[in-house]
Amino acid sequence: MNAHSIMRLDPHVAEDKLYFENKVDGVIAGLCHTDACSAEVQKTSYDEFVHILEGSLSIVLNNGHKENFSAGQTFVIPKGLICGREQSVNTKFYYMRFEDETSQPHDNVQDLGVIRLNPSDTITEITIPDTSQFQGLIPKHYKHSYYTDTTGRFLVAMWNSDPFEREVAPFNRYELMIFLKGSVTLSDNHNISEDFNAHEAAFVPYKAPYKWKSEEYLSKYYCIIMPK
């Protein structure tokens, strides 16, 4: 798999798979299979985005509270959160981690807890700073922000958009996309062209040639890591 191009994530992979890693920017993205297990309560050393494909698990906070997640659900564990994990069934999930030794946890990380994403959460229209990228009509974009780390480099949100087409350009970030509604074609305008629909996932690395074309309203979760 080309580490510098648009990637389709395959939910049917039968074993753990590392899709992408860049240690300089602290980026790790992959698919993980775990058997029934438990992990002791301890302080997390990185920010992590998780989307469950099969099975279920519980995140246990240091006060004993449990947050339960099952297939199709998505959450964020912020760096510094004191928590453990319990699961009674085999579980498969996509993940994206931000491992930056210089970043500090939020002071209120225990109040933040495990952050649950919900496709029915309220979205707000956002300003598009540069509309020159669009070919044809300028769309409206909407967002619900869930989490940003203390460096401002790790960002998780739900993002919705009207149909639009943008010209090919080098991608300015690392992004894992979980599509919730609608469809889109992502391409490099040369060798790669991939159609994505609801419940599918893509990863786009920094500097990859990237073109977007959608013909219907679309909603996705994103986990972004900005390069240094």
Language model regions located:
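Short hydrophobic/aromatic-rich beta-strand segments that constitute the beta-sheet cores
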Residues: 59, 95, 168, 186-188, ...
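Ligand-binding loop in jelly-roll beta-barrel domains
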Residues: 79-104, 197-200, 206-228
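Conserved short histidine dyad/triad with adjacent acidic residue
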Residues: 13-18, 25-44, 140-146, 152-172, ...
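Short acidic-glycine-tyrosine-enriched beta hairpin
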Residues: 63-80, 190-207
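A short, N-terminal "cap"/entry segment at the start of jelly-roll beta-barrel domains
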Residues: 1-30, 101-153
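Well-ordered beta-strand positions in beta-sheet-rich domains
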Residues: 31, 66-68, 82, 158, ...
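Conserved hydrophobic/aromatic beta-strand scaffold that supports enzyme active sites
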Residues: 29-31, 49, 74-76, 156-158, ...
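Short, conserved beta-strand element in jelly-roll/cupin
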Residues: 43-59, 170-186
